[in-house]
Amino acid sequence: MVTVTINGEKREYAQGTTYEAIAAEYQKDYEGMIALVAVNGKIRELFKKVTKDCLLEFFTLGDDVGHKTYVRTATMLFLKGICDVFGAEAARKSCVEFTIGHGLYVNTLGMAPVTAQSAEKIKARMLELVENKVPFMKRSYPLEEAMELFREKEMQDKEKLFHYRMSSLVNIYEIDGYYDYYYGYMLPNAGYVKWFDVMPYEEGFMLLLPSKKNPTALEPFDERRKLFETMESSQDWGRKAGIETVGDLNDQICSGSMSDLILIQEAEQERKIGEIAKDILDRGNVKFIMIAGPSSSGKTSFSHRLSIQLRTMGKTPHPIALDDYFVNREQTPRDEKGDYNFECLGAIDVKQFNDDMVKLLSGERVELPTFNFKTGQREYRGNYKQLAADDILVIEGIHGLNPEMSYALPEESKYKIYISALTALNVDNHNRIPTTDGRLLRRMVRDARTRGSSAQRTIQMWPSVRRGEEENIFPFQEEADAMFNSAQIFELAVLKTFAEPLLFQIPKDVPEYYEAKRLLKFLDYFLSVPSESLPNNSICREFVGGSCFNV
């Protein structure tokens, strides 16, 4: 017998008892379905067995690592469904691209008819596997053997990925004869995937899954058309460039052609910024450019580059930060924990902002405020503005797309831009890179360089940042007149050099270690690219340093 400690309670179990069996006894104490377990601080899948005295901590679908496990498992189940309904080639070539709302978009690239009937067939096969609780089997293969397995199955994307792996073993999952590789943990069997739906969408299917906030129910699909088109455009650019996966990128690095790739991508981004500037001019009456996006999107560099484009077209842009319209500290709303909530709309003096902007629009001379972050007070320091015929205001802040932020301004006077780092690169066809991972790594590298902040601190506060984005930015994405994707297909290979030493500093006995370990494993797929190759106006420079802009 072995002694297991859970939530301060000690119990004895026979050696060889699965963590799944132990979790079943404790499930009643947890609101969400248990998905994983930490054994003496190390995450383990539930099918593993207890072998000695240990301390256990369970993770549910409401935890980040548990929710990721559910999504990963449902993805493999979905691809198994495609394999059984439309054949192995259809599953092999299908690409898991990105999320829209709580839907995971899988592009079948013409390998399956995109119809409601097809979606029902895939779903029906998935439900069969769920009902029969078909297990996900995990096996460690020697690296060369794993490469040979995927070579036989014509999964060149995975074979290429493993070519650059340093580890000697690779974990491969199998369900009912279908083999695949995933970078992360899985649930024990298909019976755990209780909440999902499948619908046809564009060139593939949308796999609808529950959110971390509401993990036991499906929410209606929130179609975000502009966001989809922006992300799919970036995916298409990667396909045309021949860089769809990390293996493709590593091939480019080894071929010595990275300098060309960097210049091509930078030129592509500059072209898109120029198109946005031209659209602004073509509208004729725009006086206020409202720029918003989530943390570490590169808003500041983008604003500078857009301003340069506008200058080439005869406009005189003036930057304004919505942060300067913060209410005085004592008036700032507090969150449910009693802490100041600087990210809600109530933290901004919306009325004063609108009053000032309306006066500027009518040609008046206005003294604009400056917020003193040390004293927590708004100050007036003689910063007067008066708009001439060719003047235009570039306004940056998280609430820029919210109609309430600029309620008094005529719609024709505003041009709204949504910017985010929408990673188009995949690890391989079936392992996408969440856009939040790229932004988290950007934030980590920048905060360490400019604020002396540790990676542990950045990871610790990231959930709070994400909640603010979900509440204040993402609901207004589709209000944008233009969307700009600031992600660069090579940037994770550049960030790797800066991020890895920061992540290795995180001790093993803190909660943030789990996320640090995941990110280190993720970065291990990439070869490094030196930052010296980046031009000094690159958006990536905002994070790694060396920008010609005041960022």
What is each residue range found by the language model?
Residues 284, 407-551:
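Conserved NTP phosphate-binding and transfer environment spanning the P-loop NTPase/kinase superfamily
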Residues 327, 331-374:
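Conserved nucleotide-sensing/catalytic segment adjacent to the nucleotide-binding pocket
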Residues 312-330:
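Short beta-strand-centered segment that lines the nucleotide-binding/catalytic pocket of NTP-utilizing
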Residues 48-69, 81, 86-101, 105-271, ...:
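Auxiliary tRNA-acceptor-end handling modules of aminoacyl-tRNA synthetases
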Residues 302, 306:
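Hydrophobic positions on the alpha1 helix immediately C-terminal to the Walker A/P-loop
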